[in-house]
Structures are given as C-alpha cells and as structure tokens.
UniProtKB/Swiss-Prot annotation:
Gene: kduI
Name the record gives this protein: 4-deoxy-L-threo-5-hexosulose-uronate ketol-isomerase
The keyword Metal-binding appears for this protein: yes
Family per record: Belongs to the KduI family.
Lineage: Bacteria, Pseudomonadati, Pseudomonadota, Gammaproteobacteria, Enterobacterales
Organism: Salmonella typhimurium (strain LT2 / SGSC1412 / ATCC 700720)
Catalytic activity: 5-dehydro-4-deoxy-D-glucuronate = 3-deoxy-D-glycero-2,5-hexodiulosonate
Length: 278
C-alpha cells in the first residue's frame, strides 16, 4: 500500500515538477493479476485498480491488517467502474457481471471481494475508489443506461463533454462517495474549464481512453498559484479541496472522477472565473 500524506497549499506551491508528481500523481493503476492501492490521508480515500488476466484477483484479509480491521470494507464503502473488457465481481458469493463502463457500488461490511475477467486477451480493468463509511447500503450495479447523461460546453471553446453520474444521490445512496465518468467529444480538449474548487470535498481523476502519443496537462493548485502535471493513459491524480482540477489534452480523452467529503451535492462548487486564474 502506497501512503500519501496530506499537504498544505503553501507547501505545495514550493514544489518542483518531480515533487508535485510524487505527491499527487498515481502512475501505475493497472498491473496484471494484481490490485494496486494508494491510501491518501486527504479524506482517507483509497484509490487503485484491479486487472485479472490469468486468474481471479481477491482483496482479502491482508489489506485489513494494514487498515487496523479484518477486511477492507469493515468500515468502508467501495465504488468500482470497469474501463476494460467484460468481467465480474463476486461479493460474498454473489456474482455481478460488470461489462465495459458498468459500475458496482459495494456497501460497508462486505467480506469476500473477488474480481475476474471473461477473456484474458481483453481483461477487465476495475478502477476503484474506497471511502470511510458509517453505515451499510446495499450493493448495486449501475450501467450507463441507468444514468442520465448531461452534455456541457461547446465546440467553440473546445470543452464539449458528456458527464455520466454513476454514484450520486439521484441514482443510489452512499455514505459519502460520489463517482462518475466524463467523455470529451471528438476534437475537444478541455475539461472543467472554467474551473472550480470545493472546500467540502476532495477529488481524484483517472484519465484514460488516450493514445500512446497523447497526454493531458492536468491543472492544479490554488487559483492564483496554478501548476500542472503531465498525465498519460490510465494514470490518476489526487486533488485536495483547495486545488483546482482541470485539464487540457493533445487529443480528446475520457476520465473517471471520484469525490469524498462531507457534501454530496454535485453543484456544491466554488467557481473560479478564467480571468482570475494565475
């Protein structure tokens, strides 16, 4: 388990490129036949990926020991979105078939967590966010057909994008975790611009659906102290509540967003005008 400490905004603005990447970038999300796990002190979120190829992958009691409990979800909830091939997640003996861009919410108290791919040649890529939970909500599958996509932006400003809200109060109940998927229209490059912060939540982005010769310049930092991190395909970045989180790519891309904190109202944002950025 890779543990990342919280960092003050005054400290963050003094960091060079390598130090920024070390603090906020998660480079290796998917490793064949393993799970990856990054524990952030910021709102205690855990971020990672699971890619079963030659055999199922189980998250067992070995993780619980690192968290001071018996199992991962003794005091946590889990959200998973599959950005790879078809697969399944077995939760306490019950199999949930999870296709490409399907999602599964798993509530507090689940013990058995096994992840499988249908085809080794096109393995599932289960990306997950895990947050502290105070009560147990039912495990539930959410498919793209279950969410009402919202299209924002304009081709003229190169930010036309479709937002799919998977885990929000209108779709299902969670303790604090919100997750969704945003896809840029072809030829569009900007996400979340004009940008915002939200004092009551932190956020993690996973960028994917990117070609090998493309990248995203992820903007972060306080609005008057902006920095950037260069992102490649299937990499994630941690955004503290004091930081903007926006990006511009060399080509269109898709990203999964996940938020934890005290407020699940999606529009609870502190907007920043473009002319106020530095």
């Amino acid at each position: 388990m890779d543990v990342r400490q919280s960092i003050h905004s005054e400290h963050a603005k003094t960091l060079d490129t390598q130090a920024l990447r070390r603090e906020f970038l998660i480079e290796n999300i998917f490793v064949a036949d393993e799970y990856t796990m990054v524990y952030s002190h910021i709102d205690r979120i855990i971020v990672g990926g699971i890619m079963p190829v030659s055999h199922p992958v189980e998250i067992g009691g070995e993780v619980g020991k690192q968290l001071g409990v018996s199992r991962l979800l003794d005091r946590r909830e889990l959200g998973v979105i599959n950005i790879g091939g078809a697969g399944a997640i077995i939760v306490d003996g019950q199999r949930h078939d999870i296709g490409h861009r399907d999602a599964l919410y798993i509530g507090k108290g689940a013990k058995e967590l096994v992840f499988v791919s249908n085809e080794a040649s096109r393995p599932a890529k289960f990306y997950y966010n895990c947050a502290p939970a105070h009560t147990a909500y039912p495990t539930k599958k959410v498919s793209p057909a279950d969410v009402a996509p919202v299209t924002l932006g304009d081709n003229l400003t190169s930010n036309r994008r479709t937002i799919n809200k998977y885990f929000v109060p209108d779709v299902l109940e969670t303790c604090q975790l919100s997750m969704g998927l945003t896809e840029l229209a072809p030829g569009n490059l900007w996400n979340t611009m004009p940008c915002h912060t939200h004092e009551r939540r932190m956020e993690v982005y996973l960028y994917f659906n990117m070609e090998e010769d493309s990248c995203v310049f992820h903007m972060m930092g306080q609005p008057q102290e902006t920095r950037h991190i260069v992102m490649r395909n299937e990499q994630a970045v941690i955004s503290p509540s004091w930081s903007i989180h926006s990006g511009v790519g060399t080509k269109a891309y898709t990203f999964v967003w996940g938020m934890v904190g005290e407020n699940q109202v999606f529009d609870d944002m502190d907007h920043v005008a473009v002319q106020d950025l530095r």
